[in-house]
Amino acid sequence: VIAEKPSVAQSLATVIGATVRKDGYLEGNGWRVSWCVGHLAGLADADAYNPDYAKWRYDDLPILPEHWQMVVGADKKKQFDILKKLMNAPDVTEVVNACDAGREGELIFRSVYDLAGCQKPMKRLWISSMEDSAIREGFEHLRSGADYDGLYQAALCRAKADWLVGIN
């Protein structure tokens, strides 16, 4: 189970019985619960596509990446490595996206999922309340991650559009 932030992960973990603290996650009752700390990964800076773009020059515009790159922020690498290890652990059969319900939550989770090279089935916890009863009900009604592909694509398009407008 991967939440967007530690406080949410703690609430979810308490309800599902994952109360043993580990380095970067909680474990128990057959669950491992961790968090992303917001956007762990994002679109690469322009100089990742061409070192000449490290210094902004009008003559280089427009900068239009042919193949977009996602990168992990240097200050977030430790948590990313924890998530990658957890998602790809041999005993993990599926991964639950418990990031915030909405397009940004989809982008935050899937950026990490993709960069980690995870191929495990993905489920989605979609809740709008952090009440214990809402969390329990959400876990009883997990949906396929594929049901939210459109939201992910919308968030990714928004991120790319922001990048293009911001850089150009």
Regions inferred by a protein language model and the residue ranges of each:
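Intrinsically disordered, low-complexity regulatory segments
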Residues: 1-168
